[in-house]
């Protein structure tokens, strides 16, 4: 038993990895070193204790025409002769292949360099230098180019990356690299985009008598949009068309229009958004105006979705373009028409998530990102709306099923309206477990449209130029004193310019002699507005040209009378 226990303990030591199990003779090491170049690389790498790039602002998001600064840190175990260090600034596009046969191989990736600029920061290949053991720091700075750049992107089908790379070269050994990626964002201003037109889709029941005539008239008035969701659904609804109207045509839905739609059994849906561009984190308000031919309600009648369409081109065959759709966020609202007018106005909101890519168009090269606001109208009570996890939206069973997307809601639920029961959900915004729009489009009496929007990085407010107004010229403004408002208020209470001039002379006791003061047009502008007054200007000319002797004599007489009333001082 004692020998068996010793054997078990020895086996346990061997399984744990005792040092004796990994001993390699020096002869084997020398022979491997002479045969393998990988050992040479590891031998060069064994000299390095630390080799990294430290940016001065690591977490900063950079923009074009800015300068990146940092330090290359190198800590060596001992002296290394004949080395040189290069610094490279690289930007690269990369595409991933969808072919499962080439997954994991070099053919599964295709890359193209946006730019590559390099320079030597220590030594050169023609003139290598010596590095002593210890820590070395090499500061650097490189400017980001301002042309032909796009924002940093990393998604399933590809990526756009930018980084700073340091290369340590030595003679007869492969170089050693270290990288430091950074985020680049190209500013896209959405403040200059124009206001979009109102888009309208009109559906007509197949039971209508003048179905064909009505549809032909609508098609002549406006052209259908191939991007709209209604294009593949009109065959099921009997007839429909999409019209793009101006802002003035949105107010034509009166009683006569409603009666005409009721006679033709036509449903008219108009969608309006305030602008075409939005920034990351903003809300997209979507206003939907529905005119029905009868009273209608559905707890999930309107679904608005922010959709990203990605088009990836094949670099080896530019004619092959793959299109991918991704739903970013979604808004659901109930549809209830008024019992009398059969109309409804619903406001939905879509908030652009913070991790959304900006709109991108690389001119048929690599990939493109376009965003659309897609609105679907469910015009049948029989159509049930489900999410991707088969959760019923707007049904009686949703009251007992917890909604995982409630914590992602961007605004509070609206109050119940009309015949809405407690179990039906009100308008809400989803960021996960979205409604399966493709499944909903296959149902009857479902139509929709889409409006392209631009997702940018910022919005600059451009104030409109104010109309020109008549103002004082700069010469007359410079002549006005600082207390011109106080002088103007005092002069406005005077009875006439003559009385004002007399009061001014009478109350000036300690100043210079009033006889030397002669009023001119410039003096009078201090007391009156700059606008010319004909009556006052005529009297002012007469007053300026007359003699001031009468006013001066009265002043002297008053001063003499005041001195006579004073008692004379006794003589000394």
Swiss-Prot record:
Gene name of the encoded protein: RIM8
General function of this protein: Required for the proteolytic cleavage of the transcription factor RIM101 in response to alkaline ambient pH.
Organism (species): Kluyveromyces lactis (strain ATCC 8585 / CBS 2359 / DSM 70799 / NBRC 1267 / NRRL Y-1140 / WM37) (Yeast)
Gene3D superfamilies: 2.60.40.640
Example of a GO cellular component annotation carried by this entry: cytosol
GO BP: any one term: ubiquitin-dependent endocytosis
UniProt similarity note: Belongs to the arrestin family. PalF/RIM8 subfamily.
InterPro entries per record: Arrestin-like_C, Arrestin-like_N, Arrestin_C-like, Arrestin_domain-protein, Ig_E-set
Entries under PANTHER family matching the protein: ARRESTIN DOMAIN CONTAINING PROTEIN, PH-RESPONSE REGULATOR PROTEIN PALF_RIM8
GO molecular function: protein-macromolecule adaptor activity; ubiquitin protein ligase binding
Location of region: Disordered: 221-257
Protein name as annotated: pH-response regulator protein palF/RIM8
Ranges annotated as biased composition (Low complexity): 237-257
């Amino acid at each position: 038993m004692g020998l068996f226990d010793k054997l078990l303990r020895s086996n346990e030591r061997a399984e744990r990895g005792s040092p004796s199990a990994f001993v390699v003779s020096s002869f084997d090491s020398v022979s491997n070193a002479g045969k393998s170049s990988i050992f040479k690389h590891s031998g060069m790498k064994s000299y390095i204790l630390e080799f990294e790039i430290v940016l001065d602002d690591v977490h900063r998001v950079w923009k074009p025409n800015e300068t990146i600064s940092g330090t290359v840190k190198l800590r060596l175990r001992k002296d290394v002769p004949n080395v040189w260090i290069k610094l490279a600034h690289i930007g690269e596009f990369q595409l991933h292949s969808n072919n499962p046969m080439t997954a994991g191989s070099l053919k599964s990736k295709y890359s193209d360099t946006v730019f590559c600029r390099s320079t030597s920061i220590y030594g050169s290949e023609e003139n290598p230098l010596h590095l002593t053991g210890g820590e070395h720091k090499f500061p650097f700075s490189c400017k980001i180019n301002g042309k032909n750049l796009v924002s940093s992107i990393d998604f399933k089908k590809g990526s756009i990356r930018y980084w700073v790379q340091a290369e340590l070269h030595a003679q007869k050994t492969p170089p050693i690299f270290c990288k430091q990626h950074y985020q680049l964002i190209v500013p896209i201003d959405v403040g200059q985009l124009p206001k979009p037109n109102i888009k309208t889709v009109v559906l007509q029941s197949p039971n209508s008598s003048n179905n064909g005539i009505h549809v032909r008239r609508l098609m002549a008035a406006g052209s259908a949009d191939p991007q709209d969701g209604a294009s593949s659904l009109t065959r099921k609804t009997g007839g429909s068309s999409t019209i793009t109207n101006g802002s003035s045509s949105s107010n034509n839905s009166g009683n006569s229009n409603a009666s005409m739609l009721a006679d033709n059994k036509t449903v008219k849906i108009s969608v309006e958004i305030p602008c075409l561009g939005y920034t990351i984190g903003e809300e997209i308000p979507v206003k939907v105006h529905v005119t029905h031919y009868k009273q209608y309600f559905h707890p999930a009648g309107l679904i608005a979705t922010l959709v990203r369409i990605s088009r990836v081109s094949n670099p080896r065959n530019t004619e092959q373009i793959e299109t991918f759709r991704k739903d970013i966020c979604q808004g659901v609202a109930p549809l209830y028409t008024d019992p009398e007018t059969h109309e409804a106005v619903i406001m939905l909101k879509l908030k652009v998530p913070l991790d959304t890519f900006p709109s991108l168009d690389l001119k048929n090269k690599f990939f493109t990102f376009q965003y659309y606001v897609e609105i679907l109208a469910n015009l049948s009570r029989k159509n049930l709306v489900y999410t991707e996890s088969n959760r019923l939206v707007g049904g009686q069973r949703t009251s007992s099923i917890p909604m995982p997307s409630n914590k992602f809601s961007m605004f509070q639920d609206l109050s119940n309206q009309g015949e809405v029961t407690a179990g039906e959900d009100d308008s809400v915004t989803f960021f996960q477990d979205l409604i399966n729009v493709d499944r909903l489009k296959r149902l009857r009496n479902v139509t929709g449209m889409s409006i392209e929007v631009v997702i940018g990085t910022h919005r600059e407010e451009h104030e409109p130029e104010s109309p020109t107004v008549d103002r004082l010229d700069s010469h007359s403004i410079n002549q006005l004193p600082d207390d011109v408002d106080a002088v103007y208020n005092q002069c406005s209470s005077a009875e006439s310019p003559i009385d004002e001039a007399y009061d001014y002379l009478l109350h000036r006791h300690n100043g210079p002699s009033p006889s030397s003061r002669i009023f001119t047009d410039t003096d009078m502008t201090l007391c009156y507005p700059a606008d010319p007054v004909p009556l006052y200007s005529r009297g002012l000319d007469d007053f300026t040209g007359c003699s001031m002797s009468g006013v001066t004599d009265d002043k002297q007489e008053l001063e003499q009378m005041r001195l006579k009333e004073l008692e004379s001082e006794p003589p000394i």
